[in-house]
């Protein structure tokens, strides 16, 4: 995402992950680049309130303009504020029909990661927001 290249629905989609963050790679006086990183997509099992994507982008712009960033080369998953801790997490292949309350609870606690479930969405070139 940047100030001018973003998608409302991408912001809304990222909130359906149990853990998510923005990894900001470049900030100067006129521009920034951020990558939305999500771990453990819950989709319809997400019980969090979803904030409108336009508001999320406004919050990103406010944060970007009010935060002095130091240069760093840390991995996004190593940052202390990112609450997902994947130590000793089991990684499994599961189909949607195999999900139950216990599995979802393990996902939420970072004790289980699910892989190889195929492509979720393809936005194509729709990342550009045009007025």
UniProtKB/Swiss-Prot annotation:
Tagged with keyword Ion transport: no
Known role: The replicase polyprotein of coronaviruses is a multifunctional protein: it contains the activities necessary for the transcription of negative stranded RNA, leader RNA, subgenomic mRNAs and progeny virion RNA as well as proteinases responsible for the cleavage of the polyprotein into functional products.
Boundaries of every Nidovirus-type SAM-dependent 2'-O-MTase domain copy: 1-128
Key word Transferase present: yes
E.C. numbers: 2.1.1.-
Molecular function GO terms recorded: mRNA (nucleoside-2'-O-)-methyltransferase activity
Gene: rep
Protein name: Replicase polyprotein 1ab
UniProt cross-references to PROSITE patterns, sorted A to Z: NIV_2_O_MTASE (PS51955)
Keywords: Methyltransferase, Transferase
Record Gene3D superfamilies: Vaccinia Virus protein VP39 (3.40.50.150)
BP GO terms, sorted: methylation; viral translational frameshifting
């Amino acid at each position: 995402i940047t100030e001018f290249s973003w998608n409302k629905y991408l912001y809304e989609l990222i909130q359906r992950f149990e853990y998510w963050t923005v990894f900001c790679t470049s900030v100067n006086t006129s521009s920034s680049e951020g990558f939305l990183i999500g771990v453990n997509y819950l989709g319809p099992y997400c019980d969090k309130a979803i904030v409108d994507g336009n508001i999320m982008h406004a919050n990103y712009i406010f944060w970007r303009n009010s935060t002095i960033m130091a240069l760093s080369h840390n991995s996004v998953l190593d940052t202390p504020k990112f609450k997902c801790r994947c130590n000793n997490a089991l990684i499994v292949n599961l189909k949607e029909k195999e999900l139950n309350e216990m599995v979802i609870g393990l996902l939420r606690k970072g004790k289980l990661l699910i892989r190889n479930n195929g492509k979720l969405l393809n936005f194509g070139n729709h990342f550009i927001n045009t007025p």
